From Swiss-Prot:
Subunit: Homodimer.
Stated name of the protein: Ribonuclease Z
InterPro entries: Metallo-B-lactamas, RibonucZ/Hydroxyglut_hydro, RNase_Z/BN
Taxonomic source organism: Prochlorococcus marinus (strain MIT 9303)
Superkingdom as given in the UniProt entry: Bacteria
Family of the protein in this entry: Belongs to the RNase Z family.
Entry binding sites for Zn(2+) 1: H62, H64, H144, D215
Enzyme class, UniProt record, top EC level: hydrolase
């Protein structure tokens, strides 16, 4: 899985940072998933190497404008391109009526299947939001001024490495039989033998896991959702010195994000959703927020627009 940050500012864009959007590229299935879609996100697509035509799912954290104002335009542009097989959207209860209102009142027609899924029940009852043979998505409620949700994306474990030498030594012919054995299936051979694929594969290889967490003040629910994740993307709107304001506005400080990462035991923390106040001229800079977080959780980096990297399971990464 590859993560690309398309917007890392909170509230309003700045010269260096657009508002919230994170893309998740799934190369093996030629799909792109999007987490939040602030104003101008489709412009950010044009400045990146991402292909909007691959967009398959959008996960919305909450309905504040800096997280959703870019969604109608992006969906409309995707429709004009004429090469979408459909998009599924996941988010708070008002998401569907918001989109319907904007698209209807702007006389915009979406020429592809568009389905909206409410996540409130799944979040409150610890149910699965999305699942297929490769990936599982869960979510949890956050603590914010409006209903907000964090999302966890997990790749399911894959079969262990196939012992080709053993298969050859036992005279098992190559071809479709090998593919079935690699999947851990039981296979009947032409000579009457029955072989079990599990005897030819090593231990299952765990998949990568990513958690997207914004907007919220420090939340035990977020800690639980992020437990053991390889990557935690967490908002850090304010510096530690402005913790009182963070509580008032129901946002996180850099140290709250780091505390979440430390308690959850994640592999890496990325700080995003920075207040535009930390611009040139302010004695407090984004690097100060980074240092505050690293004092609590050392493997922390600072997001910037178009930062992109691969996410791999810690046990498999070099």
């Amino acid at each position: 899985m590859q993560v690309t940050f398309l917007g890392t500012s909170s509230g309003v864009p700045t010269r260096a940072r657009n508002v919230s959007a994170v893309a998740l590229r799934l190369p093996q299935r030629a799909e792109l998933w999007l987490f939040d879609c602030g104003e101008g996100t489709q412009h950010q697509f044009l400045r990146s190497d991402l292909r909007l035509s691959q967009l398959r799912r959008v996960f919305v954290s909450h309905m504040h404008g800096d997280h959703v104002f870019g969604l109608p335009g992006l969906l409309a542009s995707l429709g004009l391109s004429g090469n979408s097989n459909g998009v599924d959207l996941y988010g708070p209860d008002p998401l569907e009526s918001y989109l319907q209102g904007v698209l209807r009142n702007s006389s915009t027609r979406i020429g592809y299947p568009l389905k909206v899924h409410r996540v409130r029940d799944a979040a409150e009852q610890n149910l699965i939001v999305f699942e297929d043979k490769d990936i599982l998505v869960r979510c949890t409620p956050l603590t914010h001024r409006v209903p907000a949700y964090a999302y966890r994306v997990e790749q399911k474990p894959k079969p262990g490495h196939f012992n080709l030498e053993r298969a050859q030594r036992l005279g098992i012919p190559p071809g479709p039989v090998y593919a079935a054995l690699k999947r851990g299936e039981q296979v009947s051979l032409d000579d009457g033998r029955v072989v079990d694929g599990r005897d030819f594969c090593g231990p299952d290889r765990p998949g990568a896991s990513i958690v997207f967490c914004t907007d919220t003040v420090f939340s035990e629910a977020a800690v639980a959702l992020a437990a053991g994740a390889d990557l935690l993307i967490h908002e850090a709107t304010f510096a530690h010195s402005e913790a009182e304001m963070a509580y008032q506005k129901q946002h996180s400080t850099s140290t709250m994000a780091a505390q979440t990462a430390a308690e959850a035991g994640v592999g890496k923390l990325v700080l995003t959703h920075l207040s535009p106040r930390y611009a040139p001229g302010n004695p407090v800079t984004p690097n100060d927020l980074l240092r505050e977080a690293q004092a609590i959780f050392s493997n922390t980096i600072l997001a910037k627009d178009f930062l992109s990297f691969e996410v791999a399971p810690r046990c498999n990464s070099s």
